[in-house]
Amino acid sequence: MRVLLILLAFFAPIASQLMGGECGREGACSVNGKCYNGKLIETYWCRCKKGFGGAFCERECDLDCKRGEKCIYDVYGENPTCICQDCEDETPPTERTQKGCEEGYGGPDCKTPLFSGVNPCDSDPCNNGLCYPFYGGFQCICNNGYGGSYCEEGIDHCAQNECAEGSTCVNSVYNYYCDCPIGKSGRYCERTECALMGNICNHGRCIPNRDEDKNFRCVCDSGYEGEFCNKDKNECLIEETCVNNSTCFNLHGDFTCTCKPGYAGKYCEEAIDMCKDYVCQNDGYCAHDSNQMPICYCEQGFTGQRCEIECPSGFGGIHCDLPLQRPHCSRSNGTCYNDGRCINGFCVCEPDYIGDRCEINRKDFKFPDIQSCKYNPCVNNATCIDLKNSGYSCHCPLGFYGLNCEQHLLCTPTTCANGGTCEGVNGVIRCNCPNGFSGDYCEIKDRQLCSRHPCKNGGVCKNTGYCECQYGYTGPTCEEVLVIEKSKETVIRDLCEQRKCMDLASNGICNPECNLEECNFDGGDCSGGQRPFSKCQYPARCADQFANGVCNQECNNEECLYDGLDCQSELFRCPAHIRKHCIERRGDGVCNLECSFIGCGFDGGDCNNGTEAIILSDIRIKVQIDPIEFQATGGETLMQISANLRATVRIQRDELGPLVFRWDGEHEMERVEMNSSKLEDQFVLSHHVRRYRQAVVTGIVLYLEVEEICKPEFCRFSTAQSVVDLIAAGLVKSDGRMSLGLPITEAMVAVPKRNEIDEGWSRSQVILFACIAFLAFGTVVAGVIAKNGPERSRKRKMVNATVWMPPMESTNEKGRRNQSNHSSQCSLLDNSAYYHPNTKRHCSDYSTGYNGEQYSQIYPQTLANGYPGDYNELNFDFQSETFAPADLPADEIPLHVQAAGPDAITAPITNESVNQVDSKYRRRVLHWLAANVRGKPEDVITTEAIRCLKAGADVNARDCDENTALMLAVRAHRVRLSVVLLREGANPTIFNNSERSALHEAVVNKDLRILRHLLTDKRLLKEIDELDRNGMTALMLVARELGKHQVEMAELLLSKGAKLDYDGAARKDSNKYKGRTALHYAAMHDNEEMVIMLVRRSSNKDKQDEDGRTPIMLAAKEGCEKTVQYLALNDASLGIVDSMDMTAAQVAEASYHHELAAFLRQVANERHRNDIMRQQIVKSGHGAKSGRQTVKNIKRAGSRKTPTSAASSRETNHLTPPPSDGSFSSPSPHYYPTTTSTPNRMETSPEYMFNHEMAPPVNAMWYTTPPPYQDPNYRHVPPNTAFQNAEQMNGSFYC
């Protein structure tokens, strides 16, 4: 045991603590350790003080070590152990152990000869473990559950384990144990532990509950609801929450009542004395009306709201026209109305009435010439502003509100912005701002002087004076460390799989149980087709905290949608008494200061005063509101959107008027005839006239523009997509029902498309013209078909690519502009969310446009995070399965009609009738039988097909889409019919207009049974790697799709001769050629099972496509977490760069997958660290492994086994060089060969790497040895951990 501790004292600093870098950099080691530069260049290690351990001495050890010992951790940061303290001198152990020994000798006394070259592992002595040779012997490192000198002892105890579902059984020598997933505990992981799942219930508490599918439930705090208590409860929906005609406003986790004057309290239930501060002049006195409003009773001879107007001498009354010399009311001279009383000849009215005889309702009466600021109506030091023909408006100071600023404001959770705390002192509120913010409401973010307040923890100080923090840090100077709860994300992600959210995704229905960021918001069904948090550094965290009433600074940025505006004060509402006034004056060119703030839409930008502004246009939203209602309330709707976005919002327009269209639930219809003059009077129309327009629950489709008055570097929204994402995130919070307080169902960025048809043409004229054009086109097509004849076996269309030239800057700019002509964010509520549902449009559809719709989509569709995926190039035809273009034939041919119908055929079946051709679809009877969708039984279809074949039907006849009956049978999953057609000579190698054969159709349909039958045809086996129009083989099509039998189908194709790493090289001259293999497509679609199968079959993990991207790069770009982890942990190269000189980590970062980028950098750093350790070990003669090890002496001598070059059986790859003849000293560079490629470090796959695992151990220390074996039989299987090459030294021993 003492020997073991001595060994650990030497080995721990060498193996587990050698890092890349130098001691000179800040924070190389923590304050609990001292840094020493390593023997190798740019390496260092940390010597820890007593009581501390870890690679950087950052962890405090809780073991009570004896005197002369200290505590360390193993290389995994676990298993603390007491070892001897370091020697007093500061000489690194690597130098102490190597001093004085001659070359070829080592050991404490420099007398031990080093490795002689005999390979003792040739006989494979380790039964259930790995054999590692060294001088004079070998060591066996046993697998879990096995022991003994030769790993011969032990059994698999996991065969009959009782571990709960989701846990992992780990075998040991005498038993097994269950490795529990996050949130589970117990011997068999049978218990749910809420404490292990982090803050899984955001605003509530977690309670174990076996009746739930997740085995726990959340009990929400007051004001919150939802499965995970992350949704605000709208208390205002409860009847009479606020009383006395007050207005209820929902807040996050709470609500507030805006009381009518005269009432106070949380529910406005308390009547207050409004006369206390209400002064009536000239001996008038104050009273309350029925609404608790203060009114003044004036002495005769005075009038006015506060008795401030003196009437001419001898006159009185409210108009100063009542003679005071004679009584005005009496029994004979008239009475007082509305319960007024006649006192001393004049009427004294009830508080709600006024007039000389109390005949006027007070609320309908206005005193003459007093609705202006000259009478000082505003109180509490408010600023009064006269309104043109509308009276006045009071701008209240902090802490007051109301018509005349007479009401005191109460503190609410959202009174102060950016996490400030509100406190009320003597009726006046004050915001205490956090560090980095200032202003009355903490609404101003202070700029930092970088020289005085440098950014910490790796943050970067920008020109704006703000710090851009690294992942895991936040705060004005990045001083705060975030606690990222991976356990919570893991639990929810597992829940998504358990609920089969992938099957429910993109079906047009928002399923609340899948409305989580980890479930992609039900495939976009709950987010209007968007991925709103795709750019956010903390997507799951910020989606969870979005609009929850708590300011989270790490989410308070444009990429994370400003935390749902939680960090902004909610006091910005347009006062009711000037709301109409401000709507009428928005954007009229005159600055109305009373309207120039957030709540009233910044007066339409009129108070800009030359300040810079940014205008974001082409924001397309669908709103479930009646078009007629919107015609009347357009200005009010725009005001509401403006207030919620905190920016000016206007409707775009073109030369025909406002861009407002009807929406029938599926398509964008005709333009809504808005009253342009009225809207212009309201100034809710854009100032910019667009010269073209576009078209896609009923309602309207609006095209909006958002104007923000700001300098560009300080604007909240830099792109229109950010506004769309904010709207989409609001949809998420309501399960897809509304956003911005409106019933919005979808938002996207879309440029209205130019309407090429003359607006003056009628609909019937357009249809007539289209029909004529179609008939002419059909005649030409029929002539071509008749000329070429039906005897061709295939139709292949080769597209020759133009010669590529380096794009100029102007060309790139033009390309970016033109990109807007395709689609922004395709709606996931549409069937064409990711691809068109039909494999090919029928020939009759060409006249009506794509899918028969009037409008096209604008920006590239996305596969993952809101950025164009690799399937979205303009020339990529992403297509799926197809169906018959019509239920019934166009011609009334009896045999065709009966073949396509539900009943059996009764018409005569003759050689002439079975070969009769439909004039429109060019189909024959076999086509209609194979494509029958009318419910005809399968056995009847097969029997009738046999009868037609016997009558002489052409089995290989093709319709206008070049489809044979076999292709249609394959699409319809008709196995029996497919077998009959094959037996009768159907050619499965014929290609249709989509350039697909029956093989492609079968794999697209995921039909394993038909695939097995097709692969019995020898003609098809010879063309098993044929490409479709997108340059994809059947294996590639299988690899990209998820499904129950996909892996089995891929294995079947490979067993029948499909090439594993074929990249479509036969189409290199085509613009469809991408240079990708099946592994590329499996990786980019996160098909983990397929990736595992292909990698195990030795598919080239580092094959680069035409863009220089490897499978792991494509997976990183699309955010495929599981695939990236598997490839990275199975030695896929992380140092290769693509044509843009970007590594996999940089590709992930550019696509806003920050966590993936951090993971890839961690793995790359670990590899770099372990490579340095191995080199150090090799130089010092040490290479031990952890585990149960046994050393046996080998007395026989022998010659060294000559290393042989591993012959590669892969396809030749023009971008991926072959191994350098087995040399481990100078591997071929595996990166994209561009003129600017300057990778810091070459990296190769294990097949081409020097095998450091063969470094030979000796009995005492490690010494320099000759080059080790390069025998693939003794390769170490990479473990499933990020520390895949790390070596655990603590606990190892040799005998």
UniProtKB/Swiss-Prot annotation:
Q: What mutagenesis or variant effect is reported for residue 1043 to E?
A: In q224; at the restrictive temperature of 25 degrees Celsius, loss of interaction of lag-3 with lip-1 promoter. Loss of mpk-1 isoform b expression probably due to a lack of germline
Region Disordered, annotated ranges: 1177-1244
UniProt cross-references to CDD domains, sorted A to Z: EGF_CA
Q: Residue ranges under compositional bias (Polar residues)?
A: 1201-1210
Q: Which SUPFAM superfamilies match?
A: Ankyrin repeat, EGF/Laminin, Notch domain
Gene3D superfamilies, from UniProt? 3.30.300.320, 3.30.70.3310, Ankyrin repeat-containing domain (1.25.40.20), Laminin (2.10.25.10)
Entry's transmembrane regions: 765-786
Sequence ranges of the ANK repeats: 961-990, 994-1023, 1030-1062, 1074-1103, 1107-1136
User: Where is it localised?
Assistant: Cell membrane; Cell projection, Axon
Q: Where is the signal peptide?
A: 1-15
Report keywords, A-Z. Activator, ANK repeat, Cell membrane, Cell projection, Developmental protein, Differentiation, Disulfide bond, EGF-like domain, Glycoprotein, Membrane, Notch signaling pathway, Nucleus, Repeat, Signal, Transcription, Transcription regulation, Transmembrane, Transmembrane helix
Listed as disulfide-bonded, the cysteine pairs are 23-35, 29-46, 48-57, 121-131, 126-140, 142-151, 158-169, 163-178, 180-189, 201-206, 220-229, 236-248, 242-257, 259-268, 275-286, 280-296, 298-307, 329-342, 336-347, 349-358, 373-384, 378-394, 396-405, 411-422, 416-431, 433-442, 450-461, 455-467, 469-478, 496-519, 501-514, 510-526, 536-560, 542-555, 551-567, 582-595, 591-607
Predominant subcellular localization, coarse grouping? membrane
Start and end residues of the LNR repeats are 496-532, 536-577, 581-612
Gene Ontology terms for molecular function: calcium ion binding; RNA polymerase II-specific DNA-binding transcription factor binding; transcription coactivator activity; transmembrane signaling receptor activity
Q: Which InterPro entries match?
A: Ankyrin_rpt, Ankyrin_rpt-contain_sf, EGF-like_Ca-bd_dom, EGF-like_dom, EGF-type_Asp/Asn_hydroxyl_site, EGF_Ca-bd_CS, Notch-like_dom_sf, Notch/Slit_guidance
What GO biological process terms does the UniProt entry carry, in alphabetical order?
cell fate specification; cellularization; cytoplasmic streaming; embryonic pattern specification; maintenance of dauer; negative regulation of stem cell differentiation; nematode larval development; nematode pharyngeal muscle development
Assembly mode: Interacts with sel-10.
What this protein is called in its record is Protein glp-1
Organism of derivation? Caenorhabditis elegans
Supply the gene name: glp-1
